[in-house]
Regions:
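Basic, Lys/Arg-enriched alpha-helical interface segments
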Residues: 1-51, 62-69, 79-81
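Glycine-rich phosphate-binding loop
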Residues: 54
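Residues forming the ATP-binding cleft of Hanks-type serine/threonine protein kinase domains
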Residues: 74
Length: 81
């Protein structure tokens, strides 16, 4: 599932990056913790991130019901603010 904010952020991404990011997000449904993913520290929530070049996808995982919730998508310099 996608937060509304994540959908808006995706619409502002460069068109050259969009297919790569969409493909990476799609792969999360099969493997929510792919190689290179990292659990984020300093948050009360169980948040993870994947890297796609200079872009990041921040998401949460609900293992009990097998749902990946996309929280934020953006350039690495902006995503953690």
């Amino acid at each position: 599932t996608f937060k509304k904010k994540a959908v808006k952020e995706m619409l502002n991404l460069p068109s050259s990056m969009l297919p790569k990011i969409v493909n990476s997000i799609d792969n999360l449904s099969e493997n929510p913790r792919p190689e290179g993913s990292k659990k984020l520290r300093g948050s009360d929530e169980d948040l993870w991130r994947i890297r796609i070049g200079n872009y990041r996808v921040i998401y949460s995982i609900k293992d009990s019901i097998r749902i990946v919730n996309i929280r934020k998508v953006g350039h690495r310099k902006d995503i953690y603010n």
